[in-house]
Amino acid sequence: MINLRKTHPLMKIINHSFIDLPAPSNISAWWNFGSLLGICLVIQILTGLFLAMHYTSDTLTAFSSVAHICRDVNYGWLIRNLHANGASMFFMCLFLHVGRGIYYGSYLYKETWNIGVILLLTVMATAFVGYVLPWGQMSFWGATVITNLLSAIPYIGTTLAEWIWGGFAVDKATLTRFFAFHFILPFIIMALVIVHLLFLHETGSNNPSGINPDSDKIPFHPYYTIKDALGLMFLLLVLLSLALFSPDSLGDPDNFSPANPLNTPPHIKPEWYFLFAYAILRSIPNKLGGVLALLASILILLIIPFLHTANQRSMMFRPVSQTLFWILTANLITLTWIGGQPVEQPFIIIGQLASILYFTLLLVLMPLAGMFENYMLEAQR
């Protein structure tokens, strides 16, 4: 009997990607985040679609349309809370996924890694334009501050900023186009995810040891489908707990006030998942320098594969690199904390030191640690 799963043109692709895919037998729970990110994306697209049915992208009605969704639409409050907190879960999984890639040397699959970095940037852009849509105080001022950074670009900056705004300031035209961007970008993300998986399946998954796993592979289904289902249960538990018990704990109280261009909030800050980059931006007194540092903080991921000096792929057996990795993690948490603090001492100096350490770790210390570990292994022979 012909197995349709293995012969049908469309089902064959799904079969080779999610069912009969040969996977390393030793991949740990750190490999769950890819599937969780896929689920987060589906949740965000579905909840976003239902929100878009009731939302109006006009400065006069945007804020009240969000209030209308929460008050009058059937389960609108739940859809909105799932969408807002789903973004936080998305970024939590993203950061853990990228961290896993750095720790276990997955960045040596260069094509997969580069598409992943482009995905990270696209998701960040989507989240930024999405945060503007409720048209609260922090939405408006966040959009004003961040888009205004474009004016720091020499010669074309001011023209570029006004072109993005569709006027001389953030206004109705900006909100309308941001809604259009926020609607289309998730579908672009979906296309990039397919390319990401395409490149991944060219090489196969990495594994914790960093050793070629071809000699010992198992089918993805049922082993890893069950494992991913467990991860999904945890994700839904956390997401539903957030959305149902404390839906506003990760938001900003200022966003409960409608946007007022005449009243600046005392402390403008983005959502928590941008705070590390925002802290790096603020740590440089020069506007253009800050913008370049902000870009570099993300784009530095693209050069990580070229800074790999160790003979071993994974950090599993490299204690010096492990120590530096966890210092980097602590440093990013520190930057996230600093990004949410007012611009005053001692936060300024802490932010500057943490920013310097961030770049020093990735560009200097980690490559040196790899070389040192090579030397120590050679010395043992």
From Swiss-Prot:
Cell compartment(s), UniProt: Mitochondrion inner membrane
GO term, biological process aspect, one: mitochondrial electron transport, ubiquinol to cytochrome c
Positions contributing to heme b b566 binding: 97, 196
GO cellular component: mitochondrial inner membrane; respiratory chain complex III
Record-annotated membrane-spanning stretches: 33-53, 77-98, 113-133, 178-198, 226-246, 288-308, 320-340, 347-367
Binding site for heme b b562: 83, 182
Signal peptide span: none
MF (Gene Ontology): metal ion binding; ubiquinol-cytochrome-c reductase activity
InterPro entries per UniProt: Cyt_b/b6_C (IPR005798), Cyt_b/b6_C_sf (IPR036150), Cyt_b/b6_N (IPR005797), Cytb/b6-like_sf (IPR027387), Cytochrome_b (IPR030689), Cytochrome_b_C_euk/bac (IPR048260), Cytochrome_b_N_euk/bac (IPR048259), Di-haem_cyt_TM (IPR016174)
Free-text comment on the cofactor: Binds 2 heme b groups non-covalently.
Keyword flag DNA-binding: no
Function as written in the Swiss-Prot or TrEMBL entry: Component of the ubiquinol-cytochrome c reductase complex (complex III or cytochrome b-c1 complex) that is part of the mitochondrial respiratory chain. The b-c1 complex mediates electron transfer from ubiquinol to cytochrome c. Contributes to the generation of a proton gradient across the mitochondrial membrane that is then used for ATP synthesis.
Family: Belongs to the cytochrome b family.
Record text on subunit structure and interactions: The cytochrome bc1 complex contains 11 subunits: 3 respiratory subunits (MT-CYB, CYC1 and UQCRFS1), 2 core proteins (UQCRC1 and UQCRC2) and 6 low-molecular weight proteins (UQCRH/QCR6, UQCRB/QCR7, UQCRQ/QCR8, UQCR10/QCR9, UQCR11/QCR10 and a cleavage product of UQCRFS1). This cytochrome bc1 complex then forms a dimer.
Protein name, entry field: Cytochrome b
Gene source species: Sminthopsis gilberti
Gene coding for it: MT-CYB
